[in-house]
């Protein structure tokens, strides 16, 4: 299967009958974006969707790039990856850094590779900042100011990183909403840019001169479950991760040096259990730590929903009463329709 039309015929979806339109659409280099909060079912839907559109999946998850971070990121299984090719999973060691710029260039390269084989790239994930980077181009922030950075690092030691995060919320609430109050490196870098340039990170950082992704025609869908269903999914998800051996995974990552990477070690599902293990795994703190894990995950989903709803590109898809197959078919049908 090498074209959208052959996929459409096989599945019974409406396909453009006008050859000129089909030819034009082919050269638009269409990319599918499938976003949603943690626990919304993105991965499951994407695995159903990929065969319908003859697609391959590009992970848009800031933590799934790391080797060994499998259970806590709900990484797609090796068996599923054999059935549906995936990109941007396990691309670096936990001690290596990986940021939005890295993601942009990896994602563009993956899109070019997939399209060169007449397949459809499907970007799937919940990291809003990475979607933004793909759509807007790589950030082009000012050069580092190491003297100012050292001053901010000392401030963080004296005042606490939470105080610096509160300052960032006042100065640039848009950017602050994309990171956590524990992400020391990003908070310090953001304040460094603001103090050095007088400009907000959210407005300054995206003045990019090169954006290869603009050559793609992007069509996006946002999975938006009912909040009660999402909360139920998160409770089940957290329990399942613990049953599958999340604590053992965290222990192995500690041995692999995850603490050397502030982003990876502060990821939800890891930072809570790293702290628990550092304290000697006291039994009386297990339930408290588990509740922190659940609460932090739920708070993050609220940030994700707020982030994605700002973008008109994403068409909201509510799963109420729909099976995974229903949702995948709906997206595929919309993809193949003329318009």
Curated annotation (Swiss-Prot):
It comes from the Bacteria. It comes from Chlamydia trachomatis serovar L2 (strain ATCC VR-902B / DSM 19102 / 434/Bu). Substrate binds at residues 38-43. The keyword Oxidoreductase does not apply. InterPro entries: Dimethylallyltransferase (IPR039657), IPT (IPR018022), P-loop_NTPase (IPR027417). Its EC number is 2.5.1.75. It catalyses: adenosine(37) in tRNA + dimethylallyl diphosphate = N(6)-dimethylallyladenosine(37) in tRNA + diphosphate. The record marks 127, 149 as: Interaction with substrate tRNA. Pfam families: IPPT. This is tRNA dimethylallyltransferase. One of its GO terms (biological process) is tRNA modification. Keywords: ATP-binding, Magnesium, Nucleotide-binding, Transferase, tRNA processing. Belongs to the IPP transferase family. The keyword Oxidoreductase does not apply. Monomer.
């Amino acid at each position: 299967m090498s074209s959208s039309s052959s996929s459409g015929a096989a599945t019974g979806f409406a396909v453009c009958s006008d050859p000129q339109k089909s030819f034009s659409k082919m050269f638009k280099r269409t990319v599918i974006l499938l976003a949603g909060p943690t626990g919304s079912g993105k991965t499951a839907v994407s695995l159903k969707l990929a065969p319908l559109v003859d697609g391959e999946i590009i992970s848009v998850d800031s933590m799934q790039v790391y080797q060994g971070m499998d259970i806590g990121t709900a990484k797609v299984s090796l068996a599923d990856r054999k059935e549906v090719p995936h990109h941007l999973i396990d691309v670096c060691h936990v001690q290596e850094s990986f940021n939005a710029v890295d993601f942009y260039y990896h994602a563009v390269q993956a899109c070019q590779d997939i399209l060169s084989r007449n397949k459809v790239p499907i970007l799937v994930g919940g990291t809003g900042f990475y979607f933004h980077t793909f759509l807007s181009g790589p950030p082009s922030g000012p050069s580092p100011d190491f003297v100012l950075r050292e001053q901010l690092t000392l401030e963080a030691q004296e005042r606490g990183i939470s105080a610096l995060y509160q300052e960032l919320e006042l100065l640039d609430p848009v950017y602050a909403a994309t990171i956590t109050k524990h992400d020391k490196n990003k908070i310090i870098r953001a304040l460094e840019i603001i103090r050095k340039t007088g400009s907000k990170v959210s407005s300054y950082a995206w003045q990019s001169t090169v954006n290869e992704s603009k050559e793609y025609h992007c069509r996006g869908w946002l999975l938006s479950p009912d909040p009660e269903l999402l909360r139920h999914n998160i409770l089940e998800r957290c329990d399942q991760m613990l049953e599958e051996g999340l604590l053992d995974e965290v222990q192995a990552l500690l041995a692999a040096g995850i603490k050397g990477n502030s982003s990876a070690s502060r990821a939800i599902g890891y930072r809570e259990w790293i702290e628990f293990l550092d304290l000697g795994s006291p039994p009386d703190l297990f339930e408290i730590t588990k509740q922190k894990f659940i609460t932090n995950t739920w708070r993050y989903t609220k940030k994700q929903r707020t982030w994605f709803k700002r973008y008109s590109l994403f068409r909201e898809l509510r799963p109420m009463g729909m099976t995974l197959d229903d949702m995948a078919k709906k997206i595929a049908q919309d993809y193949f329709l003329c318009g």
